[in-house]
Amino acid sequence: MRLSKHINEAADTLTIDIIDNLMKVNLDYLRDIKHLLDQRRHYLQRGTNDNIEYTIKQVRQDRRPTDSNQDWHDTLDAEFQKKFHVNARSQALFCSRLAGGYGDNTYLIFPINDFYMLYSPEYPDLFLEQPKKEDMPQKAEKILRTVKKSNDWREVFGDTRPINEIMVICKSYFMIKMKYTAALDAWIKNEVV
């Protein structure tokens, strides 16, 4: 990738600082996006109550459920630990292809360095699958049989509906407001090789 000063194809241009942050992003993810530019909703998205243009953040390792039952959260974590060696409900960044209903602002998400994604094509949101306490272990096992692991965004993009919850396992990520989509598209199209 070569460094550009600005991309002026859109009203919201990419500054040198934004491009410097993009240069830290996982290159394979950027290449996957480049192949998906003609698709709608081709970025990982996350809704938050943050109100900043862009930033780099660390993924919390102690996430607690806000709407889900703690027992269901812990049961799922135990199953994810058995199958994928990660407490995905506590240690993942939750994203989707369409994050408009979560939080006040929607951001485009770019994992930094190594990452992978866990998702179920059959269960869009595990919160909605919460059973009675006595049925939790069996339900969690059933769900985990459908969960897939991939670091190929094109594969995940093609295998999920826009509303599916995607658990991104990474240490840090770059997030930028959705209003930069056109400028990002142009930068990725022209600069990512």
Language-model features, listed with the residues they occupy:
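Active-site and NAD+-binding cores of ADP-ribose-processing enzymes
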Residues: 12-23, 55, 111-193
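Extended catalytic/binding region for NAD+/ADP-ribose chemistry, centered on the ART fold
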Residues: 83-104
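Intrinsically disordered, low-complexity boundary segments flanking structured domains
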Residues: 27-36, 95-100, 152-156, 162
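Active-site regions of enzymes building and remodeling cell-envelope glycoconjugates
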Residues: 105-111
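Short His-Asn-centered micro-motif
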Residues: 46-48, 95-97, 110
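ADP-ribose/NAD+-binding catalytic cleft of ART/PARP-like enzymes
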Residues: 3-88, 170-171, 178, 185-188
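Short, solvent-exposed loop/turn segments at secondary-structure junctions
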Residues: 49-52, 99-102, 114-116
